[in-house]
Every structure is written in C-alpha cells, then in structure tokens.
Amino acid sequence: MEVLTATFVEEKLKAPVPVESCRFHFPLLRRQVNGKPLVYLDNAATSQKPQVVIDALMRYYNEENSNIHRGVHYLSEKATESYESSRGKVQKFINARSTQEIVYVRGTTEAINLVAATFGRRNVNQGDEVVISAMEHHSNIVPWQMLCEEKNAKLRVIPMNDAGELLLDEYEKLLHERTKIVAVAHISNALGTINPIKRIIEVAHKQGIPVLVDGAQAVPHTKVDVQDLGCDFYAFSSHKMFGPTGVGVLYGKKELLEKMPPYQGGGDMIKLVTFEKTLYNDLPYKFEAGTPNIAGG
C-alpha cells in the first residue's frame, strides 16, 4: 500500500494527470455551468473538496458526533481518538518535533492573530519594531498594525523590486536590537513569488529575532519541513489544500509556546479553575479554548 506523504504527493504531481480523472474525485467539478464543464481556478482562495473529505465529514456526524477531551463515554473517546490522530499526522506532515507544537486554530488568519496577541503583546513595547514584507496578505499586515498601534511600536516593510522579489540587502538593514519579530509569506498569494524563506530566517536568527512564516500558499504546493527551515512559527489552513473550512494550524517551537500566555479563555484550555485562580492546560491545549471544529479535524 502506498503511503500518502508529502514526498509521495510531490512525485505524483510531476506526472501529467488527465483532467477528467481529477474531476471524478470532486463532486462540484462534475457539474456544468452555461452548458460547459465547470472550470475552477481560484484554488489560491480556497480549493474544492474531494469526495473522500466530504465522506469523512459525514462519517463523523453519522458515527462519532460528540465533544472531545471531556467525556468518558464511547462516542467522546472515539471522537477524541480521531481528532488527536489527525494532529499526529499534521506533525509528521510538516516534520514538527512534537504534537505539542501543533496548535489547531480556525485558519491562517487566526494563527497569525494568536501570535500577535500573545507573543507580540508580551515582547513588543514602545519604540520596538515589527518587520513584514511588501507582498504580505492582509492577514499578515493588519494584526501587526493593530499590535504596533496598541504598543506605540513601528511596523517596518521589506521592499521588493519590479520582478516581485524581496530586496534582501534592504531587509538586513531593517533589523536591529529593537526588532522583536519578522513575519513574512513563504509564497505570495498575489504574485506567486517563492521567497528565500530559509535565508530570511537565518538572517533574523543571527540577531536573535524570531520569525513567523505565513505558509497558507506554500503547504498546498511544496514540501514544508519546519525543522529544516528553522522557523519559530508557521501558519497555514486546511481549506486551501482540499480540507474543510474552519481548520488551520499554528506550528510554534515548544520553548516559545510555553512562555506565551493563553490566547482565549474557556473550556479545554484549563486544568483547574477556582474563583481565585486558573491553572492552564499543557501544550497545545492551552491555546485551544472551547469546542473546536471536531469534524474538520
């Protein structure tokens, strides 16, 4: 039996695939619009869902529907087992060291907001700086703008040339002792530029600056190894790679996640609650308040 790994998928994608055989796996692509087969090219925004994904969602609601992590009955145990099994698959898919480094969120946007609201608020102060690039998606601009406004910090932007490439010499000049984090796209959603992300990370790390990578467009199209990249945070979404909406991943180095405060309060992110004090849960659950998208996970 062939195992569905990133390398396996990458090799298969090199071979030409008949369009009709692809359509067969996607119910929505079997329909016609204006008398012609539907052609969908907006995968950078969201991908269509193959039948196997739709079947998995239906199977959860038909056979396992229950809350997770907080029940001892059969359905809760089955749902919890399936949900946590998927976390292990994500860990292996991006080669994280541990499932404790895989935080489930609603999408890339929430992952970036989580880091800005926790790591950012704790580490960025008046007069400090955050560095992003000129090709960022709004989701990797606005959270940092909001943080900088709140903290009276400065947002610096890596410029790019007419070919849509970041100017790395200018990038290096932006970094100094008051730079608290660099946040940059792995692949541009607008230009398709594949940034030299490993080099960008190495330059920042020489000055002890952590790096968040927006991988929303990269994970669906290329092999991502977070340990090889050396990134401190990596964010991506399920819905751009044939998965359901409302599911995303924040990878974070364990040593950084442990120092960050919770993002939201509620069920599942706690170990013990009294009216005097709350003891927060271990990683990654400290950042996963409330009932998640269990079916999507």
What annotation goes with each model-predicted range?
Residues M1-G297:
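Pyridoxal 5′-phosphate
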